[in-house]
């Protein structure tokens, strides 16, 4: 099973992705980790990407797409969940074209819907566990409120990202995601149109529910 997941920062996308990964034994592939592994591993694509990053430039899709595909092929042989890519319409079109060329299917596209203001509040209350960033801890959500500075799941030490407390940084991230013209939501809607054509399946989830209720709804639709 191959899945692409969309959702704004604060939607619980990482948490749901982690649950799906465990349920179906999928490779949970996050875009940031792809760059870190290729650059850290000194691959040819990683070296090219690093040259752009060191100059303060965006890595072009001609490098990013092959890196994503290579990771999907090597780590996702038994199924994958791709998280954090594509981020815009152009990348969505290029990714779909590349998947078709490689003969790789895309079984499901999942979108977690959440109002922008709710997403921002969740981000500012988010606390990260040193053992697993996807363990749900949020000081503003009673159901997953941590016990002080201790993870409610494993007891690990909690911390917060500096940019999670920066409203300007959050707004910039959300400006990209909620842009329906050429941003991340435009990319999601590209796949929604493909689903209308029977080329994949598109699942929309209400992100305002509890973690458990969202998980149950998602698993019932994936079954």
From Swiss-Prot:
The pathway entry for this protein reads as: Purine metabolism; AMP biosynthesis via salvage pathway; AMP from ADP: step 1/1
Q: Which UniProt keywords apply?
A: ATP-binding, Cytoplasm, Kinase, Nucleotide biosynthesis, Nucleotide-binding, Transferase
Localization, per the record, is: Cytoplasm
Swiss-Prot/TrEMBL catalytic activity = AMP + ATP = 2 ADP
State where ATP binds: 10-15, 126, 209
Binding locations of AMP: 31, 36, 57-59, 84-87, 91, 161, 173
Annotated GO molecular function terms are: adenylate kinase activity; ATP binding
The EC number(s) this enzyme carries:
2.7.4.3
Which Gene3D superfamilies does UniProt cross-reference here? P-loop containing nucleotide triphosphate hydrolases
Q: Where is this region: NMP?
A: 30-59
Q: Cite a single Pfam family from the UniProt record.
A: ADK
UniProt domain comment: Consists of three domains, a large central CORE domain and two small peripheral domains, NMPbind and LID, which undergo movements during catalysis. The LID domain closes over the site of phosphoryl transfer upon ATP binding. Assembling and dissambling the active center during each catalytic cycle provides an effective means to prevent ATP hydrolysis.
Q: How does it assemble?
A: Monomer.
Q: Per the similarity annotation, which family is this?
A: Belongs to the adenylate kinase family.
Q: Which HAMAP family match?
A: Adenylate_kinase_Adk (MF_00235)
Q: What is this protein called?
A: Adenylate kinase
Source organism per UniProt: Desulfovibrio desulfuricans (strain ATCC 27774 / DSM 6949 / MB)
């Amino acid at each position: 099973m191959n899945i692409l997941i969309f959702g704004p920062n604060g939607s619980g996308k990482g948490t749901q992705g982690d649950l799906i990964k465990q349920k179906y034994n999928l490779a949970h592939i996050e875009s940031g980790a792809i760059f870190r592994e290729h650059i850290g591993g000194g691959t040819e694509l990683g070296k090219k990407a690093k040259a752009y990053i060191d100059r303060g430039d965006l890595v072009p899709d001609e490098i990013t797409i092959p890196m994503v595909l290579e990771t999907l092929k090597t780590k996702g042989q038994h199924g994958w969940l791709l998280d954090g890519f594509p981020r815009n319409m152009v990348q969505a079109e290029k990714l779909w074209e590349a998947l078709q060329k490689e003969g790789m299917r895309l079984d499901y596209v999942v979108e977690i819907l959440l109002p922008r203001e709710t997403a921002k509040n969740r981000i500012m209350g988010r606390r990260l566990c040193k053992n697993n960033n996807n363990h749900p801890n949020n000081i503003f959500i009673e159901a997953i409120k941590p016990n002080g500075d201790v993870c409610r799941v494993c007891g690990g030490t909690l911390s917060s990202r500096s940019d999670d407390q920066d409203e300007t940084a959050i707004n910039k991230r959300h400006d990209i995601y909620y842009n329906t013209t050429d941003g991340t939501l435009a990319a999601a809607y590209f796949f929604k149109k493909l689903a209308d054509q029977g080329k994949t399946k598109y699942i929309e989830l209400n992100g305002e529910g509890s973690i458990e209720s969202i998980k149950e709804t998602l698993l019932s639709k994936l079954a």
